């Protein structure tokens, strides 16, 4: 079988079964990032489960677009993103995108969504001045940054994930889909999806790695209590990557009746764009609240990055504000040199996984390397394509913190502010130890507290002395 591949990327065998083609209908969208189009060449590849398809060529427009206008008409963020999926999913993705764009301008839909976010989810979430954490980072001369927490942990279900789950459930209802599937790592997206399915009377199936089910037993019980069927995934590493693969296989089989609520800004177009837009409320509220609290904008934004949805929800509003630093923090696990980490943007290379081109953790043959993080929500070998794009153009910075550093930050916030953060959030909090000594006095730092840590207490007990 002749297929087309991009020599800048590698293939891997863990993404999709079946034949593939790239998204190839450029006429329906107005965006274009042709400037970043990857070079292509045709080569023959023997029997593989996921091919890197040839990028569609198109004429350059006379006027170069803003490079930060994204995605383009192919669902690409520069060379990242796209739609590398089985033929059976093309119609569903096109239908989903059409519905999303239509409902974006539907005032009835938006009013219903806003009402649910306010009365059911509990938005807006507070922008909280962490006074004692701020004092902790004061230098001997009394100077230092001011730290604010965007309290997504106070949302219904305890994390930012509910923003996207509610919106996609409403979208699924408009599409006439009665069955919902989702993947989950830490369990927060699974709980959020099970919650909205209970709210709207939809059948719910959650795929979760067997290893993650063991370390997130509380969330497994919560999902089942809410009426969801939780299916354990034992293949591969039995973590988030494998749960995502199983969810996609289910979707391929049941695409007519089923909507897949993907939980991050990853996957094939339009998911990275759509999930970003549903989480953009985080950044929009932050801008408004910052103006109310100190009459300006944040100077620095900090968020943890696994797939990257909470970070993108915070960052998106400020991407065009060049004076606002955006910092994503990945999981360094046992350390970058150990090989046991999930620092995709720090150590990864470009490839295709789960329908999109992005940075991945992979070996010389393009096979996915098993990631590691004490945090189930960061334990993923890929990352959202827009994060890859922001990294490559230098708009966002990405660093990483180890399991040990995250655990110390978990304890630190608990004792200084009386807030028990999720282990995912704890990675972002841990980076403050390195960041704060470098910041000028009075710098306004907003850190996205993406989730609460109740779910992680069982894990923390094994590692922390309190």
Curated annotation (Swiss-Prot):
Its EC number is 4.2.1.20. Its main location: plastid. PROSITE patterns: TRP_SYNTHASE_BETA (PS00168). It catalyses: (1S,2R)-1-C-(indol-3-yl)glycerol 3-phosphate + L-serine = D-glyceraldehyde 3-phosphate + L-tryptophan + H2O. It is an enzyme of class 4 (lyase). One of its GO terms (molecular function) is tryptophan synthase activity. It is found in: Plastid, Chloroplast. The modification N6-(pyridoxal phosphate)lysine is found at residue 161. It comes from the Eukaryota. Keywords: Amino-acid biosynthesis, Aromatic amino acid biosynthesis, Chloroplast, Lyase, Plastid, Pyridoxal phosphate, Transit peptide, Tryptophan biosynthesis. Its cofactor is pyridoxal 5'-phosphate. Pathway: Amino-acid biosynthesis; L-tryptophan biosynthesis; L-tryptophan from chorismate: step 5/5. One of its GO terms (cellular component) is chloroplast stroma. The keyword Transferase does not apply. Belongs to the TrpB family. Tetramer of two alpha and two beta chains. The beta subunit is responsible for the synthesis of L-tryptophan from indole and L-serine. NCBIfam families: trpB. This is Tryptophan synthase beta chain 2, chloroplastic. The lineage of its organism: Eukaryota, Viridiplantae, Streptophyta, Embryophyta, Tracheophyta.
